[in-house]
Amino acid sequence: MMYSRFRTVAKNLKSTTKPFSFTTATTTTTVSSSEFPQNLTELRARLARESPSLSDFISLKSNNAYSVEVGTKKNPLPKPKWMKESIPGGWKYVQIKKKLRELKLHTVCEEAKCPNMGECWSGGETGTATATIMILGDTCTRGCRFCNVKTSRTPPPPDPDEPTNVAEAIASWGLDYVVITSVGRDDLPDQGSSHFTETVQKLKILKPSILIEALVPDFRGNAECVEKVSKSGLDVFAHNIETVEELQSAVRDHRANFNQSLDVLRMAKDYAPAGTLTKTSIMLGCGETPDQIVKTMEKVRAAGVDVMTFGQYMRPSKRHMPVSEYITPEAFEKYQTLGMEMGFRYVASGPMVRSSYKAGEFYIKSMIDSDRAVSSQS
């Protein structure tokens, strides 16, 4: 059985805290525009050529190339060179930021201090400009140990004009793909699902061609809420499981759990119209093992999830959960290739990848366009 092989491979892919020498000759998930696969056929062909063998994983282990050590107060160490952030810029970045301030809108890009903000907002190498808008306010009712968003048991009520303001702003920006996410709103009777649905529907009316990913909270597993958002007209239903099953209680708020999140993703696949993609994401460097990661991938794929992303956890402040280790680009690429072999339609995996990373959205856009072209011919 193929999954048994994945688990055998994972046991040979050991985590380590010993530093190793990283050079630019190492293969990473970042490529130049000339090397970037331009469609899914090219991507799958490249993955087939570069499919990892058992010896690749054993090599990572023996060369201490799975992860590097995190510094401490007594033994400070610099971040690995691959974790250095780029400075945001570009005219489209400036335009979007100005409009956000005028309309008092929030983006998770800014709230979470995402390192890819400039690339995503400006279009980057692929030309697919994206942004991640956060609705339902900027204060969450939950307190996950990794998250930098403000928290409160009683946040201010949602702005009734927000769906209209968000839709009009996004429609004016010339974006190809937008991610709409929200804080958790356990204080609301419907967990904010109606507000989410209204925002998606109004944006689709103003700009039917835009692709919308809704990155939603778990709605406490409420099927009615999940169904409402799944049928709102979105193109991608995303909900993040955040970490492996074994670390859920240590990383996420006590009201969240692995099985509830998987149920949300399963329900979305059942409720959403045919052709709607489902997506999830996990952070690495929280103390998980390779074997736990592979087992989690198996369960996520069994839930029918189409797209999965992997990124390095970065500690927002000293009051947040510490980073356990920095996973290397080589290890991230192995997870990407294993994910494609498992049957995910796309896997974005790299140290700087976030759940709404635009390189992934470029391929998701290609998948949606391809699926719709086939559907229109049948």
UniProtKB/Swiss-Prot annotation:
Cofactor needs: [4Fe-4S] cluster
InterPro entries linked to this entry: Aldolase_TIM, Elp3/MiaA/NifB-like_rSAM, LIAS_N, Lipoyl_synth, Lipoyl_synth_mt, rSAM
Chaperone recorded as keyword: no
Catalytic reaction(s) noted: [[Fe-S] cluster scaffold protein carrying a second [4Fe-4S](2+) cluster] + N(6)-octanoyl-L-lysyl-[protein] + 2 oxidized [2Fe-2S]-[ferredoxin] + 2 S-adenosyl-L-methionine + 4 H(+) = [[Fe-S] cluster scaffold protein] + N(6)-[(R)-dihydrolipoyl]-L-lysyl-[protein] + 4 Fe(3+) + 2 hydrogen sulfide + 2 5'-deoxyadenosine + 2 L-methionine + 2 reduced [2Fe-2S]-[ferredoxin]
EC class of the enzyme, as a word: transferase
Subcellular location: Mitochondrion
Annotated CDD domains: Radical_SAM (cd01335)
Annotated binding of [4Fe-4S] cluster 2, by residue: C140, C144, C147
Residue intervals of the Radical SAM core domain: 125-345
Known pathway: Protein modification; protein lipoylation via endogenous pathway; protein N(6)-(lipoyl)lysine from octanoyl-[acyl-carrier-protein]: step 2/2
GO cellular component, one term: mitochondrion
Highest taxon listed in the record's lineage: Eukaryota
Any one GO MF annotation of this record: 4 iron, 4 sulfur cluster binding
Entry's EC annotation: 2.8.1.8
Co-factor binding details: Binds 2 [4Fe-4S] clusters per subunit. One cluster is coordinated with 3 cysteines and an exchangeable S-adenosyl-L-methionine.
UniProt keyword list: 4Fe-4S, Iron, Iron-sulfur, Metal-binding, Mitochondrion, S-adenosyl-L-methionine, Transferase
Binding site for [4Fe-4S] cluster 1: C109, C114, C120, S356
Additional remarks: This protein may be expected to contain an N-terminal transit peptide but none has been predicted.
Family the UniProt entry places it in: Belongs to the radical SAM superfamily. Lipoyl synthase family.
Descriptive protein name: Lipoyl synthase, mitochondrial
Source species: Medicago truncatula (Barrel medic)
Name of the gene encoding the protein in the UniProt record: LIP1
